[in-house]
Amino acid sequence: MPDSALPPCSILILAGGRGQRMGGRDKGLIEWQGLPLIAHLQRLVRPLTDDLIVSCNRNQERYAAYADRLVSDDSLDFPGPLAGIRAGLAVARHPWLLVLPCDAPRIDHALLETLLQAAGRAPARPWMLRCGGQWEPLFSLIPTHLAEEIEHAWRQGDRSPRHVLLPLGAQAIELAAGDPRLANLNTPELLAKHHELK
């Protein structure tokens, strides 16, 4: 069950990418430390929500085991993470949507709690992690009432989550450059490098 001290949120794990850096493999299903990457994220966030959404564009039957609901992009050409965010916002059951990428298994509960607690400080605005001055829009907390504004930006041709969220008054959770919790294990080399790390 979700922690009652934190705002009720839906959680979206983005696993709908092309996996180009992995030779076209489905990143969320690649194993790391004996489990698919998606399983590490699911195990971490499951206690925080009763509305866990996975955005995926293939292997839906395998992803179903890790989600309450699956969403897919409305285009077959892998249009990018903003498409998955739109799909998640469209079905989210809670006032907030916490967005995470499937290839970041080193993120921890403390960082997610920090992000969720920030919601009370600016309840009408999105929050993003900012690592060494670099915005990280795929680690974000978005009020679901902004869905229509995000949809409008999409219709205007914007495909960048950062470009869409910043004009909506996005606030930052600041992290030091190189924070290992945000490591994206999106190449075979990075998977190998982080394999022994806990």
UniProtKB/Swiss-Prot annotation:
Keyword Ribosomal protein assigned: no
UniProt EC number: 2.7.7.77
GO molecular-function term, one example from the UniProt record: metal ion binding
Pfam family, one: NTP_transf_3
BP GO terms, sorted: bis(molybdopterin guanine dinucleotide)molybdenum biosynthetic process
UniProt subcellular location: Cytoplasm
Coiled coil spans: none
CDD domains from the UniProt entry: MobA
Cellular component per GO, a single term: cytoplasm
Presence of the UniProt keyword GTP-binding in the record: yes
Catalytic activity field: Mo-molybdopterin + GTP + H(+) = Mo-molybdopterin guanine dinucleotide + diphosphate
Residues annotated for Mg(2+) binding in this entry: D103
Keywords, sorted A to Z: Cytoplasm, GTP-binding, Magnesium, Metal-binding, Molybdenum cofactor biosynthesis, Nucleotide-binding, Transferase
Required cofactor(s): Mg(2+)
Residue numbers binding GTP: L14, A15, G16, K27, D73, D103
Subunit structure: Monomer.
Similarity-based family: Belongs to the MobA family.
PANTHER family for the chain: MOLYBDENUM COFACTOR GUANYLYLTRANSFERASE
Biological role stated in the UniProt entry: Transfers a GMP moiety from GTP to Mo-molybdopterin (Mo-MPT) cofactor (Moco or molybdenum cofactor) to form Mo-molybdopterin guanine dinucleotide (Mo-MGD) cofactor.
NCBIfam families reported in the protein's UniProt record: molyb_mobA (TIGR02665)
Domain statement: The N-terminal domain determines nucleotide recognition and specific binding, while the C-terminal domain determines the specific binding to the target protein.
Protein's UniProt name: Molybdenum cofactor guanylyltransferase
Species annotation: Pseudomonas paraeruginosa (strain DSM 24068 / PA7) (Pseudomonas aeruginosa (strain PA7))
